[in-house]
């Protein structure tokens, strides 16, 4: 497996409504699209991946300029895309592993935070997986379970050495996905709290979103203020109860963590 061509493009996108997370609120951001060609012998296929480049997502420095944050994100992507075509491996996973290790060494040598460096690796990884699946006309789960990708979980997490994929995932495949709705820190819960209404006929408040779409899976952003966070979660549970849905949710407060 070799990456014989890799290109990236940037589009400027705007959010429908402001999205607040941690110390930042996003209304617009660059959107990176990456395209690569993966070659195996005489065969080749193209793969794609894309990612927003949001301020303060990978680094939590309140004093840095947004322009500098974007440059830092572009730099880690540029390094990963420069390294990828220099590698060759017997499997797609081995190719990713080489890139992963190279990116880590570069990050340590240049004082780049690991989470930020991982952005570059992950973007190439997703395009690589897409291309590898297209080479054999397989879905992602088929490529994983058949061994086509060469995935070795124990190389990432040694404690999984004696855990086979068949044992872990056999019979767990599905043909449905639940839509998970993210509740941002400043997202209005009810219509009377709506401030930034785009007037496009689509719901804005969480109450209106549940009423329109019937969503019952949520990711709730928290800010580290225990009293305020608990109060907000209670209100969300009350909304779910009013709509007679059984809510499933995760709590996301990583932006408020210091270590």
Segments predicted by a language model, with ranges:
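Short, Gly/Pro- and small/polar-rich lid/capping loops
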Residues: 1-35, 39
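Short alpha-helical segments and helix-capping/turn motifs at coil-helix boundaries
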Residues: 18-21, 31, 126-128, 161-167
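Glycine-rich phosphate/pyrophosphate-binding beta-alpha loops
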Residues: 21, 50-58, 181-185
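Conserved, mostly hydrophobic/aromatic
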Residues: 34, 42, 124-126, 137, ...
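Short acidic-glycine loop/turn motifs at beta-strand connectors
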Residues: 38-43, 173
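Metal- or metallocofactor-binding catalytic centers and their adjacent structured scaffolds
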Residues: 44-142, 146-147
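Electropositive nucleic-acid engagement tracts
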Residues: 138-162
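Metal-dependent enolase-superfamily TIM-barrel catalytic cores that perform enediolate-based chemistry
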Residues: 158-259
């Amino acid at each position: 497996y070799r990456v014989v061509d890799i290109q990236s493009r940037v589009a400027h996108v705007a959010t429908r409504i402001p999205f607040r997370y941690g110390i930042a609120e996003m209304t617009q951001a660059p959107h990176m699209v990456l395209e690569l060609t993966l070659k195996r012998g005489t065969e080749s296929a193209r793969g794609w991946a894309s990612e927003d480049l949001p301020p303060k997502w990978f680094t939590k420095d309140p004093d840095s300029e947004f322009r500098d944050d974007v440059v830092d994100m572009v730099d880690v992507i540029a390094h990963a895309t420069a390294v990828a075509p220099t590698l060759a491996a017997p499997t797609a996973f081995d190719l990713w592993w080489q890139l992963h290790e190279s990116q880590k060494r570069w990050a340590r040598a240049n004082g780049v935070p690991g989470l930020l460096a991982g952005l570059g690796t992950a973007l190439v990884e997703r395009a690589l997986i897409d291309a590898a699946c297209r080479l054999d006309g397989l879905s992602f789960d088929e490529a994983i379970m058949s061994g086509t990708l060469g995935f070795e979980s124990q190389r990432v997490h040694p404690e999984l050495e004696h855990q086979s994929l068949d044992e872990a995932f056999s019979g767990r495949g599905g043909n449905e996905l639940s839509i998970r709705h993210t509740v941002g820190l400043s997202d209005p819960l009810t219509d009377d709290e709506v401030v930034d209404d785009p007037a496009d006929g689509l719901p804005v408040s969480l109450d209106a979103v549940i009423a329109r779409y019937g969503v019952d899976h949520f990711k709730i952003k928290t800010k580290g203020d225990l009293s305020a966070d608990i109060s907000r979660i209670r209100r969300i549970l009350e909304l779910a109860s009013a709509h007679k849905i059984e809510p499933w949710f995760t709590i996301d407060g990583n932006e408020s963590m210091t270590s």
